[in-house]
Amino acid sequence: RFREFLQFDADFVGTKSLQADAELCVMISEILEKCGLAKEEYIIKISSRKITEELFKKINLDSNDQKLTALRALDKIDRLGWEGVRQLLGDGRKDKSGDFTKGANLSTSNVKTIENELNKKSPETKDLLEILKIFKDYSFSNFEFDPSIIRGLEYYTGPIFEVNLKFDVKN
């Protein structure tokens, strides 16, 4: 990786319960607040890998190599924006250093379909809807659905969470 970021991990082992996934978000929120952050200073973004899997079915994308390349491209949307991601979903992209990254070689119409579907911001999977219901039961509201939260690694298979600070970090 060419960028630096801080992260920590917490996992439940031995359960596939969506209750556990929802509780992780609540736990993250509680930890951040104990560290002195106010709810207004961060947001937990959620998505589901199943959304992209359904999308790949919709455009008849069967090649595992193309899927992985497309996921890695979509994972860069926060850094490259849609223009850069479109290039990576297509033939490829040359970055500022001059390095060329081969793209997923998707057709222009498939790239447009992906962009349109992900910009709808409508939770379409059962798992995500269940997590949203659990959040409501917990009166937990410090989250937003963001379909651009996608991980380019194969072991991500379901709900995905990411915490973003709403202020610039100095030092």
Model-derived segments and spans:
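Extended, charged alpha-beta segments that form solvent-exposed binding/catalytic grooves
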Residues: R1-F143, P147-Y155, E162-K170
